[in-house]
Amino acid sequence: MYELIQVAENSYYIQSPVKIGIFKLNETEVCLIDSGNDKDAGKKVKKVLDANGWSLKAIYNTHSNADHIGGNQYLQKQTGCKIYSPGIECDFTNHPILEPAYLYGGYPPKDLKHKFLMAQESKVEYLTENVLPEGLEIINLPGHFFDMVGFRTKDDVVYLADCLSSKETL
């Protein structure tokens, strides 16, 4: 688990419970597509980056579910990276209490305030075409969550977040 898999020249992913995309910007800098489900995932991702001599410039979140943004806070504190999320996903990521509140229909009870529904806060900015590095484009994928997106790299690799599920998951 947390094995680095190279898919194309500049496109990788980390094999983990939620696949974490890596897009290599140059020989020493990368950006992530999502960050995993919690601080422990963030630590494991950081080890992979360090082992390859890569510095993290940005995280591009596909959507605001906790299993995709849970490593944000740890990685941002460790690296100072920027984090971007699309549309209303940015608000949910900046204010993670919104996800269990949305599911509950009001202020969530304690039983709904756990790491699987509520990630730690991170400082997130709105994702726009202007903040993307060269070679990365947004694919709009609303459905699973409000403003979910995927990304296509210049290697023609796509990161589709929760648009695809395994037979076992279904």
Describe each PLM feature range.
Residues 10, 23, 34, 49, ...:
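Divalent metal-coordination and catalytic microenvironments
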Residues 7-9, 25-30, 130-137, 154-156:
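Beta-strand-turn-beta hairpins that frame and shape the catalytic cleft
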Residues 29, 58, 81, 156-157:
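The start of beta-strands in P-loop NTPase/AAA+ ATPase cores
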Residues 40-43, 47-132:
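Active-site HxH/HxHxD metal-binding segment of metal-dependent hydrolases
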